[in-house]
Amino acid sequence: MACGSSLDSIDMNSIPLVALNYTVRHRLCLYLNPDAVVAADWTRLAEEMGYDYLEIRNFQRYPDSTMKLLEDWEKKCFRATVGGLLEMLKKMERNDILTDLGPLIEADCMKYLEKKHVPLPIQDDKVDSSEQYRITKSDDPYGSMPETFDAFICYCAQDISFVQEMISRLEQTDYKLKLCVFDRDVLPGTCLWSITSELIENRCRKMVVIISDDYLDSSDCDFQTKFALSLGPGAREKRLIPVKYKPMKRPFPSILRFITVCDYTNPYTKAWFWDKLAKALAR
């Protein structure tokens, strides 16, 4: 995409898909809706977004499959950003779309950013601005674009080495997942419990619970796990992913026994561990 100089300093992955207006979406549909023998169409885009065969077949029922796909992805995925869409189109080698729609996309993004730079409402002196708007290091200071993550990592200090390996394996590889690691990402000086609750409930799609003997003694981990479990009985199995990365001397926590464990200690499945975990988080 031939980006204009006005957007050279903007991270397109920070701009949500809602920034794209109808004109861009309609033209994108004109490119992707027709069945193509050579060029990748909307079904390939759906695969890049993580949809499976049956879900893609379901989209075929709609007269405008591409438009329906974009709307569904926007609702379900926290990472539905303009940058994410552009990366997928580039991977599909649809340079024709990037070239043709580039100026329109840039214009929509600039309009979106301009709308966000509006004067803040008068704030109560009793409410600290960092507490009201900024929770994480990459949060928008004006509160218009809160930082979101693929997963909140529930861990105790003794297991930090495995957390660092998770960062290396899941963020710094082709998986390109975004993890919320409290000690790395959260700003100091805010209420611990309210910030943790906000992150788990509203900022993170999933929560990885790193289980160990030390985890069982952590009051912070206990609160985070029980809070996540309390959010919704129907969705908690999809939200919570327990990970066992080393042998334990004490019994596995009973409140997590009904959820499938991602077991790093099993020598027979260890080779598939990271790929399975990454796909579970991206789902």
Swiss-Prot record:
Domain Death: 27-105
Domain comment in the entry: The intermediate domain (ID) is required for the phosphorylation and activation of IRAK.
Keyword Cytoplasm belongs to the record: yes
Compartments, record wording: Cytoplasm
GO molecular function: TIR domain binding; Toll-like receptor binding
InterPro entries: DEATH-like_dom_sf, Death_dom, MyD88_Death, Myelin_different_resp_MyD88, TIR_dom, Toll_tir_struct_dom_sf
Pfam families: Death, TIR_2
Protein name: Myeloid differentiation primary response protein MyD88-A
The organism's place on the tree of life at top rank: Eukaryota
Function: Adapter protein involved in the Toll-like receptor and IL-1 receptor signaling pathway in the innate immune response. Activates expression of target genes in the Spemann organizer region during early embryonic development. Is required for normal axis formation.
UniProt keyword Cytoplasm, yes or no: yes
Organism this protein belongs to: Xenopus laevis
GO BP term (any one): innate immune response
Region (Intermediate domain) residue spans: 106-143
Gene3D superfamilies tied to this protein: Death Domain, Fas, Toll/interleukin-1 receptor homology (TIR) domain
Limits of the TIR domain: 147-281
Keyword set, alphabetical order: Cytoplasm, Immunity, Inflammatory response, Innate immunity
Gene Ontology CC: one annotated term: plasma membrane
